[in-house]
Amino acid sequence: MEVSQEELTPLMRQYLRVKEQYKDAIVFFRLGDFYEMFGEDAVIASKILGITLTSRDKSKEKAIPMCGIPYFSADSYIEKLLREGYKVAICEQIGDPKTSKGIVEREVIKVLTPGTYLPEGVRENIYIMSIYPSKGKIGIALADITTGQFFLYETDKNITDEIERFEPKEILIPASFEDSLKFEISSYNKTFIEDWKFDYLLAYKTLLEHFKVASLKSYGAEEFSNAISAGGALLKYLEENKQQTEFKGIKILNLSEFMLLDASTKKNLEIFVSLDGSREGSLIWVLDETLTPMGARFLKNTLSCPLLNISEIEKRFDGIEAFCGDYLLREKLEKILKDFPDIERIALKIKGKSINPKELNSLKNALKRIPELREVLRNKTEILNSLYNSLYELNELVTKIENALTENPPPVITEGGIFRDGYNSTIDELRALRTESKKYILNMEAEERKKTGINSLKIGYNRVFGYYIEVTKPNLHLVPSHYIRKQTLANAERFITEELKELELKIMSAEEKLKILEQELFIELVNSILPFTDKILNNGETIGFIDFLLSLAKVASKYNYVRPEINEEDIIEIKDGRHPVIERLIQLGKLYEGRFIPNDLLIGPADQRIIILTGPNMAGKSTYMRQNALIVLMAQIGSFVPAKYAKIGIVDRIFTRIGASDYLAKGQSTFMVEMIETANILNNATPKSFIILDEVGRGTSTFDGISIAWSVVEYIAEKIKARTLFATHYHELTDLAFNLDCIKNFTVVVKEWGDEIIFLRKIQEGGADKSYGIQVARLAGLPLEILNRAREILHRLEKKEFQVFPIRARQLDLFFQGDPIKAELSKIDIDSLNPQKALKKLKELKEMLKND
């Protein structure tokens, strides 16, 4: 804004002082009931938010652009700006306009960023991540300020894997790494901050002060110097943005306890969204029958980080088994957990003193259910008894809140009406005064009507004029002389009297005192609850786990899942396995397949570590491979699985290479994407991994493709030794089973019926002898003419007639102009040619060839 200070109003000077401090944010500047934006902020915001751009002081040559939004609907606008990667600084009026001399005092109370904002109704974690690479290791701090989680850990693996594991809303990076990390995290919101904020000693001190400990040894964090640097920088960033940072403590993440799923695997297995981008058709869509926000978070987190610890997995199996075996228990739990509030986030709001009366009341109602919840779990099984013992009955806290709050307290602390009658004697007195005063108003209205003879006279109130007497125009001649005119309307006049002003002062004074007192007492109440927050948080975690187990038990019971066996062996054995999502879509009538055909899998023994899977398109190869990967994944989150029997040897990582659509938009060819993804698998897979490869080599020429696919399978067999499902159209690859003992051929069975094929969807040992491509093309609806021509070409190929195929006569008529040399040769009468003529004709033909 190129306007001199002298030309600016006091308000705009105040705004510019604020903007100077928060140059990297869009400032929401509170003016009455609106947040206003000015200058460049207004230009940006108006485009993103789709609101009208106007200007301040339009009469001046250098008018200042501005736009505004109502403060009460700010959340949706803030969310849009954050989604675009902007920060939003909330600048509030902290002074009272009634008592302020001159301009009202304003101050930025909070800076919202993509990693620190909780949109309405979002149940998942809102992670902010800080990374610090140094000396071959990457230090990572991960926090969710809405649930109080704070993790530190280090890795020497690809940083992209860690980002994709947690999908943070915002990533903090040292400014010096901007160029080197830009591409790896291009699709995430990132903030580059000064390198000195990652200084180890400064970060260490910041962590000690924040968590109020003498040493980080108590958290087992001492040895993770890079993670400490990342953690200290993260806390400083939150502090600078005036965010509450009430964390439960530091937790060190041990990556060796979790299976790693990269973005490609999550996408190809459709874990969180289907390939069309919707939640329906994904694995979480099938498994999520959670009733609480805590349970929903637990399920999503565990799907992102499946377990490698067998005893933890078995513990979850035990819980699901207990719930599956007792329908009445499940029913009781559902009634208790239904509509349960997010008590983890409420507890954090209590710690940060940002809780409102309505939320506190919902906490009270939830805590009242804990004794019943404990009773339902008591003395059932070992796992349920441990959950019973993990829950705290906070009856003292329930009584404290119940004695204080009304049945339906307001969502805003300034509204009043927070406390019950009888809770505080001063509140009772002020309420009585307010009630009596309103009676006085009604009495005064009746008296004034009687005195003046104006039956339509009424006493009203608005925020601008306060209380007033309103008289319609036909009755103005009856107005007494002591009435003071205040406002003229189209059909009436408004007046005040000295008596009415005195009464108004009494009422307004009582209202103001009442609101101030209720605010003070509410803050006192919240402070008195602070000692209970750790137990509330603990209850939230336990209820989340119970809800998670209950959800998986409901799904297992409804869809006939079984408890898998799980061990450290390398064998995966599945009897009558089913694809959990496709089976569900068929049940709902959204896929018209009749019924899902189950299939077996045995992979891992020395003679069957790699399966080469052949068969026509549409026969079910991809479904089969995906379903087995999903069954492994489900087992390792502790879920029952869709099969008659399953034995799963722990998998450290699932790799998938299917499709390439995401990268085509980035200008990479299909084949290049195949090779990049395949290289990633070959470089990172271990003997404990489970690999799914679909049509490797299809993006190049046939011989190149076969050669690459062949060598990839050989490399996996001889070097990596991972359990692998390899689907291919290259039937030549089935010869590998004769060269390498660890490979077996399997195919999808089809039945031929004349020119038609029937997909039986069954997997059996052996290789496919045909691709059935023409039959599949017929099913897809290709024109008959094309199908007939394809059969003709196929017949010639099968006879190894690789010469140029004759073009159909109809095509010759339209397009073929003939070969002139061939035409000339056909005209020659050999019997009538003497040697001289023959040499001459040969010379002509040679010239024609030259010209051609």
Swiss-Prot record:
Gene3D superfamilies: 1.10.1420.10, DNA repair protein MutS, domain I (3.40.1170.10), MutS, connector domain (3.30.420.110), P-loop containing nucleotide triphosphate hydrolases (3.40.50.300). Signal peptide: none annotated. It holds the Pfam family MutS_III. It comes from the Bacteria. GO terms for molecular function: ATP binding; ATP-dependent DNA damage sensor activity; damaged DNA binding; mismatched DNA binding. GO terms for cellular component: cytosol. GO terms for biological process: mismatch repair. Keywords: ATP-binding, DNA damage, DNA repair, DNA-binding, Nucleotide-binding. CDD domains: ABC_MutS1 (cd03284). ATP binds at G615, P616, N617, M618, A619, G620, K621, S622. This protein is involved in the repair of mismatches in DNA. It is possible that it carries out the mismatch recognition step. This protein has a weak ATPase activity. Belongs to the DNA mismatch repair MutS family. NCBIfam families: mutS1, PRK05399.1. This is DNA mismatch repair protein MutS. It comes from Thermodesulfovibrio yellowstonii (strain ATCC 51303 / DSM 11347 / YP87). The gene is mutS.
